[in-house]
């Protein structure tokens, strides 16, 4: 399998730079037997920028992931949306304590769901208790269903109505549970408050000011602008268990209508642009100090999040993950064909972005399962110099 370090943009040229490149290269290669078709890693540190890639962006042609590949960032969309909401808060258009009912009257109602008891803060923090709309879209997670519905359009309004078929997971503010419904509503709130679509507001407030020229908010468009790796997807087969999903053969899932993710997960970007965004966000270039402090005020997570990232806490569209040198801010993303992982140090001086062209990893026989998330060691090595 191919594993190549980039040679450009290394300003130090010393032993430390070569050592970091070798370490990150080895970490990227280690993801291949875990089931990654291809890996692209981008590390930014003071005076240094390095990229490493491993495996293939196209398994048929045996070509590598392009250095400047665009990819679907999945739930890394959420910090873009949260930052946009927080800018509106800072401008006085609403507050974090504004209820959903005040902005979107009658939208969150039924089966015990009550928008008058849920605040904007609770949406962004996943403490609303709102059920997950994706449980009403099981076709996304089967081979036949995905092939039949991959080009369907799903609006945020439709997604929220699907969620309202279920009772809340808990009373607002009493617990934590990751639910994409929260961010569908956040996008709707942006539109109600601003009078523009959530995509227009994200472009106007974040994409254009930061010069994120490689970032696309696709809406219902099914393709990814070139260059890009093929996104591979596997689906659980008959008799699947958590330990053995009995995956089908991988299919090309690159072309799909991402509207089912909407403001919860449909953005397309690159390692350069996503790092520029996170560094600007943590560096205080997008939010006023008060709103950034609110974004970084965290609550404990639970369930699978703690299994993947022990000690993880969640703020307003940002996750804090402990590591060997303290911790980092992060938000991963998984969407059909693509997995994104990242981290940025608390001072914003070191950051790393990892793109894998599948979100369904199938380990090779005899390869042990990772402890926690599959990219944990790589991200730790990138952010925590030895």
Place the predicted regions along the sequence by residue.
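N-terminal carbohydrate-binding/catalytic regions of secreted carbohydrate-active enzymes
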Residues: 43-59, 63-64, 72
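Short, surface-exposed loop or secondary-structure junction motifs
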Residues: 112-327
